[in-house]
Amino acid sequence: MARYTGPATRKSRRLGVDLVGGDQSFEKRPYPPGQHGRARIKESEYRTQLQEKQKARFTYGVLEKQFRRYYDEANRQPGKTGDNLLRILESRLDNVVYRAGLARTRRMARQLVSHGHFTVNGVKVDIPSYRVSQYDIIDVREKSLNTDPFVIARETAGDRPIPSWLQVVGERQRILVHQLPERAQIDVPLTEQLIVELYSK
């Protein structure tokens, strides 16, 4: 599946938010790249809404067409469209692997999933966009447990807090999905209502 593979720091600087997590290059220069990066740009309502959508897309590594499908699905569901959209994005398997601390970044998590290192309820899944459900059980495959990414993940367990809707169990790094997250459990620097306003036009 197509995806953005360019420099993440450049995107972070353009959008004004760390899309990677712990990006030291962004922390040093948190303004847009280029000769006029520090210059003030007049913000229009449309620009602000578009920028918020781009932040969400690049945070979760989703292309425009798929992001629009997620929005349309969220809009059909009961409740707040913005909350529904974030819940859909958070339930992607690559994001769950990242949230559980088994990968340093979502991009790394996407790669681990694509390479077939995980099973969901006993079935191998290698599709990063696969959507988990409440009570799903995600396991690292036996042959993958002693590879470098998972050894490092065990050694650094606890460095990053795991959200309460997930639980990681034991040396096997089993992930239990207790529920799908509520908005208060999703710590992303997004104003999802701006995305809703953009697509509602």
Swiss-Prot record:
Ranges where the S4 RNA-binding domain occurs: 91-157
Pfam families, alphabetized: Ribosomal_S4, S4
Keywords, ordered alphabetically: Ribonucleoprotein, Ribosomal protein, RNA-binding, rRNA-binding
Organism superkingdom: Bacteria
GO terms (BP aspect): ribosomal small subunit biogenesis; translation
One GO term in the molecular function aspect is:
rRNA binding
The protein's matches in InterPro entries, at most eight in alphabetical order, are given as: Ribosomal_uS4 (IPR022801), Ribosomal_uS4_bac-type (IPR005709), Ribosomal_uS4_CS (IPR018079), Ribosomal_uS4_N (IPR001912), S4_RNA-bd (IPR002942), S4_RNA-bd_sf (IPR036986)
Where are the stretches annotated Disordered? Answer: 1-38
Read off the SMART domains from this record: Ribosomal_S4 (SM01390), S4 (SM00363)
What PROSITE patterns does UniProt report for this protein, alphabetically? RIBOSOMAL_S4 (PS00632), S4 (PS50889)
A GO CC annotation recorded here is:
small ribosomal subunit
Which PANTHER family does the protein's record reference? 30S 40S RIBOSOMAL PROTEIN, SMALL RIBOSOMAL SUBUNIT PROTEIN US4M
Subunit text: Part of the 30S ribosomal subunit. Contacts protein S5. The interaction surface between S4 and S5 is involved in control of translational fidelity.
This molecule's function is given as: One of the primary rRNA binding proteins, it binds directly to 16S rRNA where it nucleates assembly of the body of the 30S subunit.
Q: Which family does it belong to?
A: Belongs to the universal ribosomal protein uS4 family.
Q: Which protein, by its recorded name, is this?
A: Small ribosomal subunit protein uS4
Q: What species does this protein belong to? A: Mycobacterium sp. (strain KMS)
